[in-house]
Amino acid sequence: MSDRRHFRLCYVIHYFRTFEFTNGVYGLLGPNGSGKTTLMRCITGLYNVKGEHIFYNGKPVEKDKSFSRHVGYLPQKFGMYQHLTLNEMLLLIANMKGLDDKSAREGVEKALGLVNLTDCAEKKVKALSGGMVRRAGIAQTLLGDPDILIFDEPTAGLDPEERLRFQSIISEIKKDKIILISTHIVEDVHAVCETVAVMRDGKIIKSGTREEMAACAEGKTYIIDMDDLPKFKEPYYKQKQFDSDGKYYLRLVSSAPQDFAPVKPNVEDGYICALKGI
């Protein structure tokens, strides 16, 4: 039987209804300034939360000195010492996490393999590209095999192939873990997250499975020829524009009655509806 871990949050930023995370992969969506990074920093202990508002397995984390060892965190801005090699930098982080030398070496080797950086192990950090540094950040998050993994914009700056690799890593390691991913890339959420939470103004305003999130836009999602836009009743929100066979189309969400047939919604449509209160 798997070990069911959980932590519970309430009143973390401006207002939080009680929200419990159990084993699984959670996608956190929201515009800039909505509180996603603040929430993550509260969970990791980087921000002091007044009162007993964050619990891990029923115990307030501020009273649990071992809590930090359960958490792996990739901040939005991740940097490393430029004069060290990548291998030296990750070994340093592993030692700071309390790993013994043997476990550190084995953990670094495995993590570098997962993010496709084995060939860069002896390169100086200053010689790495921005995408490589981001992948190194993902690698250091995995060191020590923590129970809780928190990724803030993990695929920012990664090419499509490496984004797919990240999704594969999450799918591979997610068993018996709590994984929280904050991102602007809804495709990442759709690919790996079982539960989606939408934040606005420091609040989680909507949460549910991917299917439940998409259902928020049921009967409200349309694809129309761009030339038909004047016929589309306001209010509406443009989701995306694309071309097919030389014609341009718009994907729109609207709660207003329309003379167009709705299409099957996806997670991004549901996110827009939740964010805009449609």
Task: Identify the meaning behind each predicted range.
Residues 149-152:
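Catalytic Walker B motif of ABC-type/P-loop ATPase nucleotide-binding domains
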